[in-house]
Amino acid sequence: MEDSVRLQFDYTLNGKPYDYTLIEFGSHYCVPCRLMESVVDSVRVTRPKVNIRFVDAAKEANACWLDYFRIDIIPQQVVMDRRGKTIFRHRGYIPYKELVEHFK
């Protein structure tokens, strides 16, 4: 799994034009997760150099992602730099202004 994450999110290796990755772990059944949708949508619009991924924690196929990132509650956000290194983690709802501080 580590190699897969590095290949997908280390933009110095794969040449993709992103500076950051935001992985939003959540579920469509979770009220705080649904509140995060508008925050993530705002990041998508205002920060084109941020690669955004949503991982549905309710889907069994995503269990390996939850294990790898040690996700124990949702919503949870993981921000990685362009080398794929985790630089910020947050558990629960986070307002847009607070989240975008990590994309400087």
Stretches found by the model and what they are:
Residues C30-R34, Q77:
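The canonical Cys-X-X-Cys-His
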Residues F25, P48-N62:
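Thiol-based oxidoreductase modules, predominantly thioredoxin-like and allied folds used
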Residues E37-V40, L66, Y96, V100:
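Extracytoplasmic/secreted envelope proteins and their assembly/folding machinery
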Residues K59-I73:
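Short Fe-S-cluster ligation motifs
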Residues C33-T46:
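Typically the conserved alpha-helix immediately C-terminal to a functionally engaged Cys/Sec
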Residues L13-H28:
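Short active-site neighborhood of thiol/selenol oxidoreductases, capturing the structured segment around
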Residues I73, V78-K104:
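Non-catalytic, surface beta->alpha helical segment in thiol-disulfide oxidoreductase systems
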Residues M1-T12:
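N-terminal "domain-start" segment that seeds a small globular fold
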